[in-house]
Amino acid sequence: MRGLTDGRTPRGTRRTTQAASTAVAVFVALGVSLAGCGTGGTGARDEGPAHADAVGGAGSASPAPAAKASPSKAPDRVDAVRLVKADPKVSPEVKRELKPCVADEYPIDVSYGKVTDGSADDVVVNVLTCGDAVGVGSYVYREEDGAYQNVFKAEEPPVYAEIDRGDLVVTKQVYDKGDPVSSPSGENVITYRWASDRFTEEYRTHNDYSKAAGNAPTPAPEPDS
């Protein structure tokens, strides 16, 4: 998962917003009526396709065209880098990590959606490291009186926050003593819900990573005979 180390198999018990779109092809068979010979001596006759007035009766009104749905308004984009750097609640360590990796590309993920009861979309920001894209800070900003206010922060890396059906879901990887940085022992998945002007923890799930999967040594190549 983005923002977390990849030394273990990702969790299988929870996956947010997983969906697969399946395209369905519909084929319409066009029937062709074969003309038969009339018994009244009129000869062969071609029968064309049925018309709408033959099915629905003469003078049937054509159905009104379906109304087009108006496109949803895209959320206003914010300068997340400036927002984080100007935020006094963000630690100096995270601000030091927030620097361009290549040219003017910053290691930052930004999501827009509803996780509070504000009138505008909330902004979820994840600050990552440049080298391995590990999350070092997760924040939620809520618009209040025309300005964005920090209403949530988590700065215990590796950490990553997501919006899941109106809830805030934060994943934190955990380490046992002796675990290398690339191989955490598990993760805590914490779901927060907005109530009474703050986030409260609803529930949490702990997942242990396998110690065997993915750790088999790579066999040495056999010498050419």
From Swiss-Prot:
Gene Ontology CC: one annotated term: plasma membrane
Compositionally biased spans, kind Low complexity: 60-73
Subcellular location: Cell membrane
Cysteine-cysteine disulfides: none
Domain of life, source organism: Bacteria
Lipidation (N-palmitoyl cysteine): 37
Keywords on record: Cell membrane, Lipoprotein, Membrane, Palmitate, Signal
Region (Disordered): 40-77, 205-225
Lipidation (S-diacylglycerol cysteine): 37
Membrane topology: Lipid-anchor
Signal peptide from the UniProt entry: 1-36
Job description of the protein: May be involved in the stabilization of the cell envelope or may interact with the sensor protein CseC to modulate its activity, in response to cell envelope stress.
Protein name (database record): Lipoprotein CseA
Gene designation per UniProt: cseA
